[in-house]
Curated annotation (Swiss-Prot):
Residues 124-502 form the Protein kinase domain. GO terms for cellular component: plasma membrane. It comes from Photobacterium profundum (strain SS9). It is a multi-pass membrane protein. The active site is at D288 (proton acceptor). Is probably a protein kinase regulator of UbiI activity which is involved in aerobic coenzyme Q (ubiquinone) biosynthesis. This is Probable protein kinase UbiB. HAMAP family: UbiB.
Length: 545
């Protein structure tokens, strides 16, 4: 049952959607006539922005609806398998910049998390925020204990009820869409909302972001290509994150990078190497690598170092996903479309009864024109996009982990080519993928497997004679038990056979006595019946053994 507050919010959402003419998204279909009639008969609201494109109207509507919808639009901008370019491009322009809330209020919430006055632990706290977004706000300070510059990231007050209310309405809408439009079920709208809810709630937990940052920092410890700021978990909590303050050039500021003498070619190639290292070596990748979260160090511009912030959203791939992904990319660039089709079936991404020949032909038809371009002009992200779009026609369900990966790959690829338009992603990535595959399935993989098990066998080897003796002894005892069970079983079978024999003789004698008695023979029937009863008793006794 919808509550009054939910109804009020739902009315606001519908009002904004109609004011921006978003009912134009509804297809011409008998099932959509009612929603279109509602605009005219119930709300009397006209499209107030007919001069703007549909994509721009969608972006403006989401901005007006607030932070939950802005972030949802940002996530949807990466789903180019669902939206055409003119929609996805507009969604990508959504900026997660909102009016800052009062610095004194931010300080109060920080002190609640810290358990005391902020001056106890920090000096030079600046009440003017360094940055403000829909989920959190950032202020600068220095640590009292050592004078290190830090930033304090605090969750916006009262943001959770707003998020929960809007997510609940999103679920209602997703269920309606799935019910009204059966063809939308393959897109799994309810699961898309569920994935978004998880992502959003993860971002509300500052300790989760701290843990992700610590993991990524450890993975690239002493790396010359990627730096992750230090987290100060002693001062952090669910609502507050304290981290090292960094100085760098925002990656989208091309002019500043050039002015600093940055080696743009190496910087772009490092971006690709960092991404594939995270995915294939670590199985743990930063999945929110938009320009606002990525900086470049001022130091050593000839060997530039990336700086990664905001690890609230990360992705992981299991061993099978990594292998199928690597094999797919290698098969693509060798134009082995049969292999691509077989990999999709083997992985379970498409149904097992898929016609391989038809699937191969569909992939070839879509992807062969792509490879007519020079390799340096081919987009990895768009190759995956075309593949997923084709596979959807063969009932491939959305794979959330692959969507997150595709989004990140598009970010990395876009950044790399923005920095250095001649970036050849294939030349950079191919050696990495081939080396990784050889280590997974080649002779080196066998050596690595033996090496990984060596400590275990080294520990167990001294115990081997004792384990062998115990095994033989237990085997002997087991054989004795089996022999005894077999003897008991055979004895039981013999007893049951003897019992059936006695019952048969007894029954025969009783029947004979009955026949004789009916013929007025008196002595013999009595003796026959007595013998029959005796045989029955013998049979009953045999059954009990």
């Amino acid at each position: 049952m919808i509550t009054p507050s939910e109804f009020k919010r739902l009315y606001k959402i519908i009002e904004v959607q109609l004011r921006y003419g978003l009912d134009d998204f509804l297809p011409e279909d008998p099932r959509t006539k009612m929603p279109k009639m509602a605009r005219k008969s119930l709300f009397w609201i006209k499209n107030q922005h007919p001069d703007k494109s549909l994509g721009e109207r969608l972006r403006l509507a989401l901005q007006e609806l607030g932070p939950v919808w802005i972030k949802f639009g940002q996530m949807m901008s990466t789903r180019r398998d669902l939206f055409p370019p003119h929609i996805a491009d507009q969604l990508a322009l959504l900026q997660d910049q909102v009016e800052p809330f009062d610095g004194n209020l931010a300080k109060e919430h920080m002190e609640l998390s810290l358990g005391g006055p902020i001056e106890t632990w920090f000096d030079d706290f600046d009440e003017t925020p360094l940055a403000s977004a829909s989920i959190a706000q950032v202020h600068t300070a220095t640590l009292k204990e050592n004078g290190r510059e830090v930033v304090l990231k605090v969750i916006r007050p009262d943001i959770l009820p707003v998020i929960q209310a809007d997510i609940k309405l999103m679920y209602r809408m997703a269920h309606i869409v799935a019910r009204l439009l059966p063809e939308a079920r393959l897109l799994r709208p309810v699961e898309v909302v569920r994935e978004y809810e998880k992502t959003l709630l993860d971002e509300l937990n500052m300790m989760r972001e701290a843990a992700n940052s610590i993991q990524l920092r450890r993975n690239f410890e002493d790396s010359d290509t990627l730096y992750v700021p230090e987290m100060f978990t002693d001062y952090s909590s669910t609502n507050l994150l304290v981290m090292e303050r960094i100085y760098g050039i925002q990656v989208s500021d091309i002019d500043a990078l050039i002015a600093n003498g940055t080696n743009m070619k190496l910087l772009s190639e490092n971006a690709v190497n960092i991404f594939f290292t995270q995915v294939f070596r670590d199985s743990f990748f930063h999945a929110d690598m938009h320009p606002g979260n990525i900086f470049v160090s001022y130091e050593n511009p000839e060997t530039p170092q990336w700086i990664a912030l905001d690890c609230g959203i990360v992705g992981t791939l299991n061993r099978d996903d990594k292998r199928y992904l690597a094999e797919n990319l290698l098969a693509f660039f060798h134009r082995d479309y049969r292999k691509v089709a077989e990999l999709h079936v083997d992985s379970g991404w498409v149904p097992q009864d898929t016609n391989i020949d038809e699937f191969e032909f569909a992939i070839r038809t879509v992807c062969e024109p792509i490879f007519e371009k020079p390799l340096c002009d081919i987009s990895f992200g768009h190759v995956l996009l075309n593949l997923f779009n084709t596979a959807r026609r063969f009932d491939m369900e959305v794979q959330p982990q692959l969507m997150l990966l595709q989004k990140t790959l598009l970010y990395v690829e876009g950044l790399g080519r923005q920095l250095y338009p001649q970036l050849d992603l294939w030349i950079t990535a191919k050696p990495f993928l081939e080396d990784w595959m050889s280590r997974q399935v080649g002779p080196q993989a066998i050596v690595e497997a033996v090496k990984s098990k060596a400590p275990f066998w080294a520990e167990k080897l001294p115990e081997l004679p004792e384990l062998l003796y115990d095994s033989l002894r237990q085997g002997k005892v087991m054989n004795q038990r089996i022999d005894k069970l077999y003897d008991n079983f055979m004895e039981s079978r013999r007893s049951q056979g003897l019992a059936r024999f006695y019952f048969g003789i007894g029954a025969t004698l009783v029947v004979c006595s009955a026949i004789l008695f009916s013929n007025h023979v008196e002595t013999i029937p009595v003796a026959s019946a007595a013998m029959g009863v005796t045989f029955w008793l013998l049979g009953w006794r045999a059954c009990r053994k």
